[in-house]
Structure formats: structure tokens, C-alpha cells
């Protein structure tokens, strides 16, 4: 079931020539859908405008999970932070939308997170590391990067 959901989400959000990458990150593949708090979806556009951002959000609101046999109502979280909905029969789609430049900044500021994302094989378009890679994790990253060790 999750493989079908992953494939559906990847193709659903890879709907425009301006979108360079769609990657599903997190534990969706390893868990039952009922045990998943949210589905993390990274979307990288070549250049993100206000109109394209709104187009992605509008497109997301039209998603129909019932078409693939999943009877859950999708709830959107287009913020970069966690947002949990405690509604039964729903699943949170956590859309993290970047353009190439903001993705580069995220790699620089949060190399641990981005390194983890790069390891995902659940993507369409360019691999995240093809857009801008985490070259290596440095000792200083353990202290100064977001999600580093304090």
C-alpha cells in the first residue's frame, strides 16, 4: 500500500516543468500508514515565484487519495515546521517547497537533514544531490548547524 502511495505522491507533485525534484523523505516506506504522523514531501522548483508556490498548494488541495484506495483525508502543512492535526481518518502532507537557491541555503545551514534527504531513493526528477549536494559533514557542523549536537 505504501509503495503505491509513494508512487502516486511522486507523480502527483511532479506536475510542472518548473519542478526539478520531488522527494519523499522520512519513514513512510518502513511503517504502516496508520503509524505515520505525516508524510514529508520535498519539492524543489528551479525558480519559486509566489504564483508557482500557490499553484503547488492549490494542486495539493485537489489530491484524491481515495483514487488509490486510501480512505484518509489529506491535511496540508506547507510550513517548514511540524504541524500535527489530531483528526482521525486524516493524514498530514508536509510540503517543504524550495527553489534551487533556497535549497542550497538549506544544505549549508542544515547539512544533517539534507544529507539524510539525499539518501532517499523515493524521488522523481533530479536527485537532491544533483541540485546541490552535501559534500561532507564537518566537525564544526556538529556544533553550529541546525540539528547539530549541543
Model-found features: residue ranges?
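Hydrophobic/anchoring residues in structured secondary elements
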Residues: 21-24
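Acidic Asp/Glu-based divalent-cation binding sites
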Residues: 38-40
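Catalytic core of pol beta-like nucleotidyltransferases
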Residues: 1-18, 29-36, 45-150
Amino acid at each position: 500500500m505504501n509503495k503505491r502511495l509513494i508512487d502516486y505522491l511522486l507523480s502527483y507533485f511532479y506536475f510542472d516543468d518548473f519542478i526539478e525534484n520531488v522527494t519523499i523523505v522520512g519513514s513512510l516506506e518502513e511503517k504502516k500508514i496508520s503509524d505515520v504522523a505525516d508524510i514529508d514531501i520535498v519539492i524543489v522548483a528551479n525558480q519559486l515565484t509566489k504564483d508557482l508556490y500557490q499553484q503547488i498548494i492549490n494542486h495539493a488541495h485537489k489530491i484524491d487519495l481515495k483514487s488509490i484506495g486510501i480512505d484518509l483525508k489529506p491535511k496540508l502543512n506547507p510550513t517548514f515546521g511540524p504541524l500535527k492535526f489530531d483528526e482521525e481518518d486524516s493524514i498530514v502532507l508536509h510540503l517543504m517547497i524550495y527553489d534551487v537557491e533556497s535549497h542550497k541555503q538549506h544544505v549549508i545551514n542544515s547539512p544533517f537533514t539534507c544529507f539524510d534527504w539525499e539518501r532517499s531513493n523515493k524521488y522523481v526528477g533530479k536527485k537532491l544531490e544533483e541540485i546541490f549536494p552535501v559534500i561532507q559533514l564537518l566537525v564544526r557542523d556538529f556544533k553550529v548547524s541546525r540539528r547539530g549536537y549541543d
